[in-house]
Amino acid sequence: MKRAAAEILHEYGPFPGAERVHGVTFDGQHVWFASGDKLNAFDPASGQAVRAIDVAAHAGTAFDGRHLFQIAEDRIQKIDPQTGQVLATIPAPGGGTDSGLAWAEGTLWVGQYRGRKIHQIDPETGAILRTIESHRFVTGVTWVEGELWHGTWEGDESDLTRVDPQTGAVLERLDLPSGVMVSGLESDGADRFFCGGGSSGKVRAVRRPRS
């Protein structure tokens, strides 16, 4: 297993009206984050907030290229980012204990926080296709170039962990500074992760290592 200190490249926020950051995703242009009763978008080039959608947004957030997916209590909502309309709803596998959310080549990966699990599910039905175990509490989840990464938070320590999506074996860890929490997690598809900062109200960009 490879292990290194995480390199924080930039901090965004806190943002007006958003006391906490839950899920985080990236639509290719804007970073979206969940703040409880809203989905908020900002421009990572300028750090400026650009829009918000009034919708329940309690945990993980994902983007499939067209739609946003958002955990709200015990369900996952499919949302049209143009109109803010909820198009469909499926049950969340953790029944309200869910954390991170990631779109991955036709399926969703869903973190289960205290259960220390990550479920791969069918985005149409919510059916669980696979479950892998984590070594710590699971926060955000992201999928990039065939790699499955998730955030952890336990004992006042956080890291970004890359795991084998078949077995759950830990392949790589990036340790964040003590007290820096990772809530949501997303990749920009290249060299950065966007990490939700929980009650700090911030989103941090962290360098993604290239193997």
Predicted stretch roles:
Residues I8-F15, G47-I53, Q85-P91, A127-I132, ...:
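A short beta-strand motif characteristic of beta-propeller blades
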Residues V182-S211:
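Blade-level signature of beta-propeller repeat domains, shared across WD40, Kelch, NHL, RCC1
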Residues N40-A41, Q77, H119, T161, ...:
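WD40 beta-propeller blade core
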